[in-house]
Amino acid sequence: MDFQQLADVAEKWCSSTPFELIAAEETERRMDFYADPGVSFYVLCPDNGCGDSFHVWSESEDCLPFLQLAQDYISSCGKKTLQEVLEKVFKSFRPLLGLPDADDDAFEEYSADVEEEEPEADHPQMGVSQQ
């Protein structure tokens, strides 16, 4: 995929997130993203003929630790698309953006269902005779 196509994918992704694509450097194959309150990162895109993968980084000391999840994902097996990488970065930054963690929402829904169940009574306990 050429760099302009990658930039188009990034723009489309930004339209559904708080992030803005603030710079796209074709010569460096680098895209810079920013969202309030001061959350920034950049993506280095692999060259077409190269087997390299995407690389994400932040020059902000506050943001860098949150990128570990995305960096681990990128370095895991298999080729990743820019869309997949950006989604993982967004998930990593949710706490910094003041958004609930996507996994926490699913867990809370599941917990709520469990809490609504009535405990079943009159079950004999194991090892206790019913005489």
From Swiss-Prot:
Instruction: Report the protein name in the record.
Output: Maturin
**Cross-referenced PANTHER family:** MATURIN
* Pfam families named among the record's database cross-references: DUF4581
Task performed by this protein: Promotes megakaryocyte differentiation by enhancing ERK and JNK signaling as well as up-regulating RUNX1 and FLI1 expression. Represses NF-kappa-B transcriptional activity by inhibiting phosphorylation of RELA at 'Ser- 536'. May be involved in early neuronal development.
Q: Which organism is it from?
A: Rattus norvegicus
Name the predominant localization. cytoplasm
Q: Cite the entry's keywords alphabetically.
A: Cytoplasm, Developmental protein, Phosphoprotein
BP term (GO), one: positive regulation of ERK1 and ERK2 cascade
Where in this protein does the record put region Disordered?
107-131
Query: What is the gene called?
Result: Mturn
Localization, UniProt = Cytoplasm
Q: How is it modified after translation?
A: Phosphorylation at Tyr-34 is essential for its ability to promote megakaryocyte differentiation.
Q: Key word Oxidoreductase present in the record?
A: no
